[in-house]
Amino acid sequence: MAAVTMSVPGRKAPPRPGPVPEAAQPFLFTPRGPSAGGGPGSGTSPQVEWTARRLVWVPSELHGFEAAALRDEGEEEAEVELAESGRRLRLPRDQIQRMNPPKFSKAEDMAELTCLNEASVLHNLRERYYSGLIYTYSGLFCVVINPYKQLPIYTEAIVEMYRGKKRHEVPPHVYAVTEGAYRSMLQDREDQSILCTGESGAGKTENTKKVIQYLAHVASSPKGRKEPGVPGELERQLLQANPILEAFGNAKTVKNDNSSRFGKFIRINFDVAGYIVGANIETYLLEKSRAIRQAKDECSFHIFYQLLGGAGEQLKADLLLEPCSHYRFLTNGPSSSPGQERELFQETLESLRVLGFSHEEIISMLRMVSAVLQFGNIALKRERNTDQATMPDNTAAQKLCRLLGLGVTDFSRALLTPRIKVGRDYVQKAQTKEQADFALEALAKATYERLFRWLVLRLNRALDRSPRQGASFLGILDIAGFEIFQLNSFEQLCINYTNEKLQQLFNHTMFVLEQEEYQREGIPWTFLDFGLDLQPCIDLIERPANPPGLLALLDEECWFPKATDKSFVEKVAQEQGGHPKFQRPRHLRDQADFSVLHYAGKVDYKANEWLMKNMDPLNDNVAALLHQSTDRLTAEIWKDVEGIVGLEQVSSLGDGPPGGRPRRGMFRTVGQLYKESLSRLMATLSNTNPSFVRCIVPNHEKRAGKLEPRLVLDQLRCNGVLEGIRICRQGFPNRILFQEFRQRYEILTPNAIPKGFMDGKQACEKMIQALELDPNLYRVGQSKIFFRAGVLAQLEEERDLKVTDIIVSFQAAARGYLARRAFQKRQQQQSALRVMQRNCAAYLKLRHWQWWRLFTKVKPLLQVTRQDEVLQARAQELQKVQELQQQSAREVGELQGRVAQLEEERARLAEQLRAEAELCAEAEETRGRLAARKQELELVVSELEARVGEEEECSRQMQTEKKRLQQHIQELEAHLEAEEGARQKLQLEKVTTEAKMKKFEEDLLLLEDQNSKLSKERKLLEDRLAEFSSQAAEEEEKVKSLNKLRLKYEATIADMEDRLRKEEKGRQELEKLKRRLDGESSELQEQMVEQQQRAEELRAQLGRKEEELQAALARAEDEGGARAQLLKSLREAQAALAEAQEDLESERVARTKAEKQRRDLGEELEALRGELEDTLDSTNAQQELRSKREQEVTELKKTLEEETRIHEAAVQELRQRHGQALGELAEQLEQARRGKGAWEKTRLALEAEVSELRAELSSLQTARQEGEQRRRRLELQLQEVQGRAGDGERARAEAAEKLQRAQAELENVSGALNEAESKTIRLSKELSSTEAQLHDAQELLQEETRAKLALGSRVRAMEAEAAGLREQLEEEAAARERAGRELQTAQAQLSEWRRRQEEEAGALEAGEEARRRAAREAEALTQRLAEKTETVDRLERGRRRLQQELDDATMDLEQQRQLVSTLEKKQRKFDQLLAEEKAAVLRAVEERERAEAEGREREARALSLTRALEEEQEAREELERQNRALRAELEALLSSKDDVGKSVHELERACRVAEQAANDLRAQVTELEDELTAAEDAKLRLEVTVQALKTQHERDLQGRDEAGEERRRQLAKQLRDAEVERDEERKQRTLAVAARKKLEGELEELKAQMASAGQGKEEAVKQLRKMQAQMKELWREVEETRTSREEIFSQNRESEKRLKGLEAEVLRLQEELAASDRARRQAQQDRDEMADEVANGNLSKAAILEEKRQLEGRLGQLEEELEEEQSNSELLNDRYRKLLLQVESLTTELSAERSFSAKAESGRQQLERQIQELRGRLGEEDAGARARHKMTIAALESKLAQAEEQLEQETRERILSGKLVRRAEKRLKEVVLQVEEERRVADQLRDQLEKGNLRVKQLKRQLEEAEEEASRAQAGRRRLQRELEDVTESAESMNREVTTLRNRLRRGPLTFTTRTVRQVFRLEEGVASDEEAEEAQPGSGPSPEPEGSPPAHPQ
């Protein structure tokens, strides 16, 4: 695969799992090939193109990002060439993003990308999506893009493929995420959660279903798998719960056809073994308003359409259903066809039955759904004379009351004239039409919502069987996605608020908690702030106070009298108007009331009916009526009618008295309930280990195969995908405790930890050392060890391999033991056979001896007397054994009876306990409701009491408050006077400070005059220094020291980093100062303008300070630009440092030669430096004097800045205090005015209200006493219930004790069985000896036949009893033992009884029978064991074969390495021999290389001169810009001191300061000149690669022509296939028409046969629909072809548009270039001194211009080739136009066929109507007609199947041929490239062989073997040559630096760095003069060394 793990060395790509269906492979696995960086051959072309063209990503409006080749790279801009159109652009460098190498194409984990940027992530996702790969890992989480089509990657085979696999072993999939969470839950014993998040329509619900499907398959219990067909199985119920929730909670929206209109959290409980033991579903915020009202192009919930389209006639009659168009609540039509609705309805009913819903419950639910629709059909009108509502037609009301079990009269009265409470009495109030309509809609919404809540509770009761057994759980969250409509309401606010919380949880988990754990564990880590904190937006919504959020303000408005939606919006704007995430509407015409800036974008909200939605009021009269309904379900869901908000309470909000308000605590708003449920959900998720699945919407058109880049980029930015990948790569995502790490991986380091006790941390560190891990891959914390991504997976693989080796060793030892044991047994058998043979031979010798015969006859007679005694003793022993056996049988029977009794008692107690638990739960729920009710009442009472006290104190406090306000006003006036005095004092301090500043400036002027004198003296010394510097420059030119260059780069980088940190710190301080000053100054200005005019002088001072602030801001902006430039320079310097380090590694050989020369020259250089330092000693005193003066100036500046800062701080503090005082004064004055106006009105109302409240308080106290009495009664009842529960608990404990005793007895029996098993092992050894004695004992048994028969009968009886006992024991041990143990137990019992019989009675024949039976069983067992052994051996052989293949591959790899090393040795030896024999060849090569080196040196000199000229110009422009900025800053500073005055002398002094600063900046610029040379190297690459690009371009053009031709052939073939299919369709349709006509004739003749014919017709219609579906599929393919063609045309048009735009951009840039040239010429005139320094480069400028003209000529040729390509593209467009004509003709034919099909469909409908009319008269059925019709249908079906099979075969052949053609084309290209490469190598070798001698001919065979190595060595030599040339160029750059230092030494005393740079510029002047001399005398210069070493100059 393309995925390559970068963090773990040596990690391999995951192997492709075993059997995977072929149809699923393209959608799971990344295709291997050139794009994926396949093999060497396959991946050469993309890799070469990527390397040669330097491909990058540039922004594109259409594609998001577009590939381009980097042509030229400047300091701030770069020139790129678009890969598709070939157009060139100049873009800022920060808009260009790097491209990953081709081997990272379609990477499975985006954390592995080398270049991590938005373009690479988007390209990777787009490539995978277009290849059908919708799942991609993004660090620690998974990204899935909705494919908008069905994919075959969710079958059982795919589930089995992911089962038990680690993440890196299988492709990305939601199954892999689920498997990882499931395994983490089992291993870590930590609750897990899987969060599917994303926008609406992204696929969250589908992925949730797949997660549940996988868990139900993987974690199903073995008990459930015994009988899979039994309904009620837990896993099946869990799967069937989804269709029910989707039917009642999902609906079709604009973005999604199956959108979840509620949120759900499915908690699946697991036991300790990992099996599912129960589930629980929690739902959040059902969008109940959809049941009564839907937006345009949207539908209501699925269940309505399923019920109307899928119910039978009888059910429709029972539920009083009507067509869909008759219902007012269903504004839009059904979401799918009636056939689909019927199937979905049957599926929903079947799911309800599986979940255990009874038929009565299902009918009650459907009746309530029909009643919700009937609510909307009730029509109300307004009476003529009054506003009262009436119901002229009560038909809909009668249907509604029939469905809900209500009385029509009561319902109408409660709806139109409800009883409301006025004081203590109830009166009937007539409702207006608007109020009644609102009440009806509210009742409909509430009914559906309560039905949904009841349904969820019923599902939980069915799923949550045993919650106490759950050891841990795994939760799946599916919440409504983020929604942004044109106008959004309260439901969208709640949904988006939930998504904000989830995204904040993701950010907190990924970015904050991760880093906090690093810091907690003591790992060195720098905290990274990714800027993804969403808390401000969450606070805006949920904050309770200071200031309150949207929900708190909404709840507050619900309590206020006469509150409206408008007042709510105004209060929100007042409280949250300044919040950064809140925006007001900008224009009055805007429909939105306010906007919230969510993480996913700006959302406009319209606050219509938000107060009503938040309170959710109902008609409490109708609600009470519903509670008393005769329908059980209706009464149950309306049982809690006490806590609802009545309509009279809502009306009191608008009509009540001014001081009245509803009772607080009586009900809770929707916002409060939702906020609490969301808080519980967040707490649950925070206690789990979350796994995130980020779902992405590819387009809003719901089209498959289309991806909009901008849309996907926005979602990636919002989801924090890049940040998640970055912290996964930088951090340590895998961690494990020390103890677990040691326990799990100690097997890998067996001897690393010494014996004895050792601390866990020390043990882990020793293990890590033994594992030899890279220290960068892990960190050791305080309690855990942390690993980078992939390291733990590698350790797991090594552990698996180690465990495999150990198991193999154990198996080998076990098999060896078994083999030795079998061998010993075989030896024993052989010895026994020898004894028997010896005895038989002796018997054969003795049987004819007469004495022997006599002995055999007499010996039995001697034992007859003793035989009776022996038999009698054995009979007694046998009787004892039988008694013991009977006694044990009786004990076993008693035990079994007791166990059965205990089981019954346990079941009874469990049932009783379950009932008690349910009663206890109900009592607890009742108690909770009562407690809540009590608390609410207590709150109301306490609030009323507090209000009474507050109102009594209010009148007393108003007067005191008024006096206090007046006194405060007086204090404020006095404070203002004090502030005015302080202001005047500050003004005096300012004048004093300015005087000090003037004095400081005069001192500075004197110092600068002295400095000018010192400068003149320094110039005299510089002339002498220049002579020594010129000599040193000639010697330093030959040094080319790479070490000095590296040290310079490191010093430059360190200096830049220091400056960057300082600049950043300064910028942050300035930004903070700017923000603080902006806010404070604006507030002060507004308050001072509004409150008083006396602060005019202070405002003038504020204006002057603002001007100073603007100047400071300008300086800050300049510093920010300089910082950005330094950042760029830093990056370039780092890149140059990396290149220099690489060059350092490759140039070690060449460095040794240069090192020797450097030491010689270094000694001379040190001598010259000593002389130079002696000359500089005389200037040290002057430099020390100057440094002291500079230090004094610096200290004076610091003192001045400190005083200015103190002054500004004092002014700001004064402003702040003044502003605060004015604000408080204004606020208190306003409050006083409002209080004074409202006090008189309020006092009268309060007096009346106090009397009413006292009366109400007395009534409430009586109600409180009654509530107390009821509470006491309920507490007594609760104590009784608890007592009963305690009795049940004690009974349960006794039952548990009895059960434990029974288990102990069972364990005793099991011990006896185990002893029998041990005896079996011993008897198996004795069996062999018994079998040997059996033959001898058979002759003795002939005389004991009678006794044998008697004993045989006893034995059979005992065997029967033993069999019964064995069966009973097997039943008891079935739960603990498997079939093998049972077989061993039976065998052990048989062997035991047989042994006793042989010892006691000698009944050997019965023993023989038992032996044969045991032998048969043993043989069967042995056979099974052999089969298992054979299976194991087969698997072992397969494993060994794979291991052997792996070892072979490893050996082959080692052999290849050895071969490579051998070839390298041969190559070196051959090179030595060849060097001796090819002197002439080498001389020719050296001459050619010398000529090439001279040409390159001249080109390099020309380029260096060009670069020097351009760099000087750029430096001059930069200095001019900085000079202008400093002048502007100086003018700004001087303008702020107009009152002090300015002078010409001060301006001149400021100019000199600016020039000095410019000189310092110029020094910084010159230090960065070397880094700019890398950008100019593109010109050299362009000249080298033009021809290669031209060849590649022609090859690409030819490939595109071939691809277009292939595409045309494929389209033509598809058209032919479509025509063939259309003809076949026409034939089938003709046959169907003929069959229909025949049926019509038979209808006229045989009307009695129409029932069966109708059934057959329906089947034929199904076939016709299938064929129509196939035709639609073909039409869809034609449409896709057309769309693809249109997309190609649109892309061509877009390319032309972009070309024109870019041409205009080029013209604009040329104009800007001309303007910059004019500015540059002006700058050249201003800087005459620098023009003298670059005068030496004018001679080479003409040659550079000539070269530039040549390059422009070549570019013109390339443009002509581009025009040829455009003409070729026009030819391709013509071909596509022809294909379009063919497609249109086929479209017309298809439309004709479709019209014919429509006619046939109309005929079919007419025939159906006739059949419907005659169906009532049909009585009999004709079997013959049915048979004939079935034969016709079978024929049609067979033809259709043949056509489908033929179509599939042709499709497969077409796909296969396409693959073969593409494979052949790839192979052909590879062969062509290989042939060209071989031809080139052969030409080179042929030239060398022609120049060789006889020695070369003798070594020809060795040359053929090593020709590939020779070519590589030649390429390496060329590379070394180029690198040596690069070193030469770097030395020349050093020369330029020396020249710069010389120039600076002329200007004044310099630091060591400045002197070095001046010396480099002096050296450059020397180089320039040497180059002019060489151009004048080309033959006089020395020739270069053969290996590219620098030319030797004379010393």
UniProtKB/Swiss-Prot annotation:
GO terms for cellular component: actomyosin; brush border; cytoplasm; cytosol; extracellular exosome; growth cone; membrane; myosin filament. ATP binds at G198, E199, S200, G201, A202, G203, K204, T205. Residues 1981-1995 have a biased composition (Pro residues). The modification Phosphoserine is found at S60, S1969, S1980, S1983, S1989. GO terms for biological process: actin filament-based movement; actomyosin structure organization; mitochondrion organization; mitotic cytokinesis; neuronal action potential; regulation of cell shape; sensory perception of sound; skeletal muscle contraction. Myosin is a hexameric protein that consists of 2 heavy chain subunits (MHC), 2 alkali light chain subunits (MLC) and 2 regulatory light chain subunits (MLC-2). This is Myosin-14. It comes from Homo sapiens.
